[in-house]
Amino acid sequence: MSKFLLYWFVYGVVCSAAYDILKAPNYFEEFVRQYNKQYDSEYEKLRRYKIFQHNLNDIITKNRNDTAVYKINKFSDLSKDETIAKYTGLSLPLHTQNFCEVVVLDRPPGKGPLEFDWRRFNKITSVKNQGMCGACWAFATLASLESQFAIAHDRLINLSEQQMIDCDSVDVGCEGGLLHTAFEAIISMGGVQIENDYPYESSNNYCRMDPTKFVVGVKQCNRYITIYEEKLKDVLRLAGPIPVAIDASDILNYEQGIIKYCANNGLNHAVLLVGYGVENNVPYWILKNSWGTDWGEQGFFKIQQNVNACGIKNELASTAEIN
């Protein structure tokens, strides 16, 4: 790395970690310019500033107490509840067909490699952006199938989240869904098209799927029960990247590093578990989000292992076998 790039890397980290609450008005005006924010009135702008100030204080506190680094980002003028409501989407479906088999992992975890990352094998597709549509469940589910396809065929493809939003009769589109029910819906539909044939619209629409263009189907799906968080390592290595449910409340302003303190108050978001590692004797999980590459570590984030950070082991992990 050149001295120039190293300087800007260090400068960026220091700046994001060393905010001054007294400079909140300046930060806000820069935020408005950077993200081209448009407010309907001065009253609305003031209201958003107060939310921004509250979030800034939270960022400063996190940077003081956590090993991860947090920064002002595109969510910083939204309340936590607003962001969760607009940019996540894990929720109960209207009904479930229970196609997925429940697998109990009751043996203690065995010994495996200290580090593992599916990205190193080129089995993870690019980070996407769900926008203001509560379809995290579709993004995480299809991200896992994209990886399954890459493992089987040594080729990366992008599947259609819009097909899931429009045609999945089990989940409820941009209003939310679950991981295992998304797999069940794919079994019912018969398969999924690629994104180019059924592009993403970030909103609900009528179903336009073409079964003659399906490229991936689901043969069967499994849901895993275990009291051992570390057992996820075995599933990850043997079955491929895993869509998991988390509480996203404490990751909204994340920039980089290992999150040690993460709320576990209720699952509201779905992401893809792609790997794990150890840094300064702290074991961590690597997860792929669906908030674009301008969030986190180019769209990825890390949380500490074995403390149930963000509630990662609260919900049954789901995987699927493609056909």
From Swiss-Prot:
Signal sequence range: 1-18
SUPFAM superfamilies: Cysteine proteinases
Disulphide-bonded residues: 133-174, 167-207, 262-310
Homology family: Belongs to the peptidase C1 family.
Record: glycosylation sites: 158
Gene name of this polypeptide: VCATH
Sorted UniProt keywords: Disulfide bond, Glycoprotein, Hydrolase, Protease, Signal, Thiol protease, Zymogen
Name of the protein this chain belongs to: Viral cathepsin
